[in-house]
Amino acid sequence: MDTTTVLDKYTQDLSNLPLEVKHLLQELKNKDVQLQEARKRYQTKDNQIHKFIRANGTLTKHPKEQQIYNKVEEDMVLVKKLQKEKILLANTALFLVSKHLSNFETDIAKLEKDELLPPVDNVMELDTPSSDMNSVINGLSDNLSGTTTPRGHSASTPVADNAANSMLRKAQKRKHALGMKGASGLTRPSKRMKSEDFEDKKYDNDSLSRPNEGPGNNGEDADNNLYCFCQRVSFGEMIGCDNDDCKFEWFHWSCVGITAPPKDDEIWYCPDCAPKMEKRKKKRK
C-alpha cells in the first residue's frame, strides 16, 4: 500500500458520503418540522384552557378539558419521541464522518510506520499553500479529465505521489491538531461519571483548537483524549458502553440522548453497538 493507493481508496470511499449525510440531515429537518407542529398544537390547546379559566374562573370546568389534556399529552409524548429520533439521526451522521476519518488516520499511521509517509513532526513547512494546491491539481487533473499519463512499469507517477503525500500530510496535521485519541488505559469502574471524576480536570471549550502533544509529552495530569461520537474531550456527565470492543468507549449524555443515569446493574450499549449486540444475541438463541 502506497500513498497514491490510499488517496484513491478514500476518494472512492467518500464519494457517497455527502449524499448519505445530506439524506440524514434532510430526515432530521423533517423530524424537526413535525416536532414544531406538535409543539404548536399542544401549546394552542393549553392556551385554550387558560383562556377559559381567565374568563370563567377556576371553579368552572371546561366542557372538553379532559379531551384537550389527552391531546396535549399525546403531542408531548410525540415531541419527546421525535427529539430522540433527531439525536439518533445527528449521531448517525457524525458517526459516518468519524468512521471514515478514523480509518483514514489508521492508514496514515501504517504509512508512517512503513516509512512511506514522513511523520508530521518531521515534515518541513517549506511548501507554500499555492504549491500544495498545484501539486494536488496536477496529480488529479488527469483522472478528472478522463486522460491518463504513461507510467510504464511504475506503480505511480512522481506527480501523483506528490499530490497524495501533500493531501496525506494535511490530514496528518489535522489529526494532530485535533489530538488523536490514543490508548487511554481507562478501566470502567462505573458506567456513569462526571468529567471531574473522569479525569479530575476541567477543560475549556477551546481545547479542540489547541494542538495535542504526542504521548509522553502531555504530563500525567493532562488528558486531551477525544471521546464519544462528537470526538471531544470529557465534560459533564459521561457514560461507558458495555461493549468491550466499542470504538468510542465513553459518551457524553447529551450526545446519546440520556437524561438520567442507568441503574448499576443495567446494561447499556451506544447507538452504534446496540444493533450489533442485538444481532449477536439473536444468533446465540
From Swiss-Prot:
SMART domains named in the record: ING (SM01408), PHD (SM00249)
Domain of life where this protein originates: Eukaryota
Record: residues binding Zn(2+) 1: 228, 230, 252, 255
Main subcellular location of this protein, as a coarse class: nucleus
Protein name as catalogued: Chromatin modification-related protein YNG2
GO CC term (a single one): piccolo histone acetyltransferase complex
Family: Belongs to the ING family.
Amino acids binding Zn(2+) 2: 241, 246, 270, 273
Site (Histone H3K4me3 binding): 227, 238, 242, 250
Domain remarks: The PHD-type zinc finger mediates the binding to H3K4me3.
Biased composition (Basic and acidic residues): 193-207
Zinc finger (PHD-type): 225-276
Free-text function comment from the UniProt entry: Component of the NuA4 histone acetyltransferase complex which is involved in transcriptional activation of selected genes principally by acetylation of nucleosomal histone H4 and H2A. The NuA4 complex is also involved in DNA repair. Involved in cell cycle progression and meiosis.
Molecular-function annotations in GO: histone acetyltransferase activity; histone H3K4me3 reader activity; methylated histone binding; zinc ion binding
A GO biological-process term: DNA repair
Subunit architecture: Interacts with H3K4me3 and to a lesser extent with H3K4me2. Component of the NuA4 histone acetyltransferase complex.
Entry keywords, A to Z: Cell cycle, Chromatin regulator, Coiled coil, DNA damage, DNA repair, Meiosis, Metal-binding, Nucleus, Zinc, Zinc-finger
Biased composition regions of type Polar residues, renumbered to the chain: 138-165
Coiled-coil blocks: 19-54
Organism of provenance: Debaryomyces hansenii (strain ATCC 36239 / CBS 767 / BCRC 21394 / JCM 1990 / NBRC 0083 / IGC 2968) (Yeast)
Record localization: Nucleus
Chain positions covered by the region annotation Disordered: 138-218
